[in-house]
């Protein structure tokens, strides 16, 4: 399937390409709306899968170099399109370790094996399982070579290793944990 096995040498890069739209609560109207990930600031409220709207604790970014090859590796961008992900409002581009949240029945045996080799186990966010986009056959490597600014957000949580399900361009994905956002050498806003 073109997968290259990886062992992470540090915290994973779990980010959205600049321009990704995140579901939030508008501070003035108190209505749900979308805002570009790079425009999110600490204290804004992001829509979660099971916990309503929660405040942002950290906003961070970094620049990554994206190759033009089709290699399925962690440190690159992948694109998810509407034809394969019906809830998407527009294509979603994110880094290889960023997870889409799925039901356990959606995993393939190969995906389970690859994730266990990388992480030691399958991880959950709420009642959904995490599928790193680099292991999702429906996602394709984003083969536009260049430097890209990628962003992520961490929401308030009493446990710094936990995250939430959030909506990016309409797709249910993971937010970043406080631990990972602080260890991953991001620039904080």
Located regions from the model:
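Accessible peptide chain termini
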Residues: 1-2, 189
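A recurrent domain-boundary module in secreted/ectodomain proteins
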Residues: 2-13
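Long beta-strand-rich cores associated with HINT superfamily self-processing modules
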Residues: 12-32, 45-188
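Structural motif
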Residues: 38-45
């Amino acid at each position: 399937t073109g997968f290259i096995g990886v062992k992470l040498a540090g915290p994973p890069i779990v980010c959205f390409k600049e321009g990704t739209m995140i579901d939030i609560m508008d501070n003035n109207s108190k209505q749900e709306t979308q805002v570009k990930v790079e425009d999110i600031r600490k204290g804004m409220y992001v829509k979660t899968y099971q916990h309503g709207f929660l405040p942002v604790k950290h906003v961070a970014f970094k620049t990554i170099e994206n190759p033009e090859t089709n290699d399925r590796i962690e440190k690159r961008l992948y694109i998810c399109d509407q034809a394969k992900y019906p809830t998407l409002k527009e294509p979603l581009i994110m880094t290889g370790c960023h997870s889409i949240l799925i039901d356990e029945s959606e995993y393939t045996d190969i995906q389970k094996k690859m994730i266990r080799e990388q992480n030691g186990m399958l991880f959950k966010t709420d009642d959904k399982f995490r599928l790193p986009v680099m292991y999702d056959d429906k996602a394709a490597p984003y083969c536009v070579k260049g430097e890209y600014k990628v962003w992520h957000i961490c929401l308030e949580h009493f446990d710094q290793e936990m995250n939430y399900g959030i909506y990016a361009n309409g797709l249910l994905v993971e937010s970043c944990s406080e631990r990972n956002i602080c260890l991953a050498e991001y620039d904080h806003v």
